[in-house]
Amino acid sequence: MRQSKFFMPTLKEAPSDAVAKSHQLMLRGGYIRQVTAGVYAYLPLGYRVLRKAENIIEEEMDNINVPEMIMPHLLPATLWQESGRYKKYGAEMFKLQDRHGRESLLGPTHEETFTEIVAKNLKSYKQMPLALYQIQTKFRDENRPRFGLLRGREFVMLDGYSFAATREQLDEQFDDQKSAYLKIFNRAGVTVHPVIADSGTMGGKNSTEFQAPAAIGEDTIATNEKGTYAANLEMAKSIDTFKQEPEEAKDLAKVATPGMDTIEKLADFLKVPSTRIVKSILYIADDQKVLVLIRGDKEINEVKLGHILDADEVRTANADELVEITGSEKGGVGPINADWADKIIADETVKDLYNVVVGANETDYQYQNANLDRDFKVDEFADIRTANEGEPDPVDHLPLKFTTSIEVGHIFKLGTYYTDTMGADFLDNNGKAKPVIMGSYGIGVTRMLSAAVEQHLTENGIAWPKEIAPFAIHLIQMKMKDETQTKLAEKLEKELSAKYDVLYDDRNERPGVKFNDADLVGAPLRITIGRKAKDGIVEVKRPMDEKATEVNISDLDAVITKELG
């Protein structure tokens, strides 16, 4: 490919609103251009990278016998209403009406459609296990699109779906997909951690995220140094090392605590450690009033709590509701005489505490010396706390380390979440009707490309992993009017293009312009044809090298083969 004919509008400086390095470099290098907030055009350089990533996916899916297909972008609302997700998905769904008033949506994912088109046509256990996938543009009405391709309103995604007659088949499919995904990320040069994750609005109970460590990441993962435990912070567990020595129960005492509306203020006012205080927070779970208790030095993990409550909507009570329901403003709510609560759930940290401070359900008042069972009851204990960095992990009891990361993939064991509600049954080997068991598998392809850039930055540009680099070799001719350089450049272009993707910079530009653009192209090998062309010598440089190396033309093939294969 001749660079003089290649549309690659580079920028000297990134726009001021581009925060992520990947966003800055993709704009500066002419990979993408913004059309509107969260929506991008993929220019030739960016599209080459995208297609190479898609080719890797196609090859690895072929290797596990999963065929590709394509579903429509425009979906009827009725399918999502049938599954119950039309309302649950929330404001991020692009909804529209046709001229006849029929409601539709732009697909953010396709579980319902695959259930309707595929699962409902699987009538016998003999047709399973089966898996299919597609690579297509998805739509999500992000409230704050940002970081370029990392959080957009339109993005390219691989989404795959599996169909099984038994749980054992689903487990095998899940493991096959996980293995294939790890190979995809490895070939794309993206370092990932498979971590325990929340299924969110997707349904099902078991899921694994693939998290790519990066400074710009919006997620946090908790891992140990041995790699035997890894979880998204939303789902991370840890061992609580605090132990309170048993005490004789003291008399319950009501005390005034004016203006003490935080744990820190209350602990200082009462001269007690935060571990001797039990926080009480009122949640509204659908139409239930749930009082949640946790030790004062810990924070409630609302994702874990949501799993326990299993409600469509879980939120904290607002200020007016607090007073109306409990009789107290914030800071004074507590579990004693909390007959207004439909349920009381406590974190495990509350189990073995003695003579603690709890709210008195009266503004500016607390009880001291409250004791579980004697003074208040708990309906259910569960792990609903947020893990802290440095706490022991639950597997090897090693300190947890927190890392910011980018979610680039997510796989789910959906089970019968969709097939139950949408009526997709098959006949088992005994002739009995059963719901098809499903799995769902996704890679954010464009997000993966941004993660690759974030993990492969150079001082002035990108060092693309070789399998997704837009070009394997960037051939740069220093003086276009030098016939010796031109002859050698054209000879190398012809020879190398037979085996590799080659970009030949044949522009009549200054060397500084050419080298700056080459840093942004980020080809695994840069071959510069300069003043020593007459001696049969070129300069070879990898993106991470500080200086180029002179190589005789007779040795060039061996050097290239060593680097690129």
From Swiss-Prot:
<keyword id="KW-0030">Aminoacyl-tRNA synthetase</keyword>
<dbReference type="InterPro" id="IPR004154">
    <property type="entry name" value="Anticodon-bd"/>
</dbReference>
<dbReference type="InterPro" id="IPR036754">
    <property type="entry name" value="YbaK/aa-tRNA-synt-asso_dom_sf"/>
</dbReference>
<dbReference type="InterPro" id="IPR002316">
    <property type="entry name" value="Pro-tRNA-ligase_IIa"/>
</dbReference>
<dbReference type="InterPro" id="IPR050062">
    <property type="entry name" value="Pro-tRNA_synthetase"/>
</dbReference>
<keyword id="KW-0963">Cytoplasm</keyword>
<dbReference type="Pfam" id="PF03129">
    <property type="entry name" value="HGTP_anticodon"/>
</dbReference>
<dbReference type="GO" id="GO:0016740">
    <property type="term" value="F:transferase activity"/>
</dbReference>
<dbReference type="GO" id="GO:0002161">
    <property type="term" value="F:aminoacyl-tRNA deacylase activity"/>
</dbReference>
<dbReference type="InterPro" id="IPR036621">
    <property type="entry name" value="Anticodon-bd_dom_sf"/>
</dbReference>
<dbReference type="InterPro" id="IPR044140">
    <property type="entry name" value="ProRS_anticodon_short"/>
</dbReference>
<dbReference type="InterPro" id="IPR007214">
    <property type="entry name" value="YbaK/aa-tRNA-synth-assoc-dom"/>
</dbReference>
<dbReference type="Pfam" id="PF04073">
    <property type="entry name" value="tRNA_edit"/>
</dbReference>
<keyword id="KW-0067">ATP-binding</keyword>
<dbReference type="InterPro" id="IPR045864">
    <property type="entry name" value="aa-tRNA-synth_II/BPL/LPL"/>
</dbReference>
<dbReference type="Pfam" id="PF00587">
    <property type="entry name" value="tRNA-synt_2b"/>
</dbReference>
<dbReference type="GO" id="GO:0006433">
    <property type="term" value="P:prolyl-tRNA aminoacylation"/>
</dbReference>
<dbReference type="GO" id="GO:0005829">
    <property type="term" value="C:cytosol"/>
</dbReference>
<dbReference type="InterPro" id="IPR033730">
    <property type="entry name" value="ProRS_core_prok"/>
</dbReference>
<dbReference type="InterPro" id="IPR004500">
    <property type="entry name" value="Pro-tRNA-synth_IIa_bac-type"/>
</dbReference>
<keyword id="KW-0547">Nucleotide-binding</keyword>
<dbReference type="GO" id="GO:0140096">
    <property type="term" value="F:catalytic activity, acting on a protein"/>
</dbReference>
<dbReference type="GO" id="GO:0004827">
    <property type="term" value="F:proline-tRNA ligase activity"/>
</dbReference>
<dbReference type="InterPro" id="IPR006195">
    <property type="entry name" value="aa-tRNA-synth_II"/>
</dbReference>
<comment type="similarity">
    <text>Belongs to the class-II aminoacyl-tRNA synthetase family. ProS type 1 subfamily.</text>
</comment>
<dbReference type="InterPro" id="IPR002314">
    <property type="entry name" value="aa-tRNA-synt_IIb"/>
</dbReference>
<protein>
    <recommendedName>
        <fullName>Proline--tRNA ligase</fullName>
        <ecNumber>6.1.1.15</ecNumber>
    </recommendedName>
</protein>
<dbReference type="InterPro" id="IPR023717">
    <property type="entry name" value="Pro-tRNA-Synthase_IIa_type1"/>
</dbReference>
<comment type="function">
    <text>Catalyzes the attachment of proline to tRNA(Pro) in a two-step reaction: proline is first activated by ATP to form Pro-AMP and then transferred to the acceptor end of tRNA(Pro). As ProRS can inadvertently accommodate and process non-cognate amino acids such as alanine and cysteine, to avoid such errors it has two additional distinct editing activities against alanine. One activity is designated as 'pretransfer' editing and involves the tRNA(Pro)-independent hydrolysis of activated Ala-AMP.</text>
</comment>
<dbReference type="GO" id="GO:0005524">
    <property type="term" value="F:ATP binding"/>
</dbReference>
<keyword id="KW-0436">Ligase</keyword>
<keyword id="KW-0648">Protein biosynthesis</keyword>
<comment type="subunit">
    <text>Homodimer.</text>
</comment>
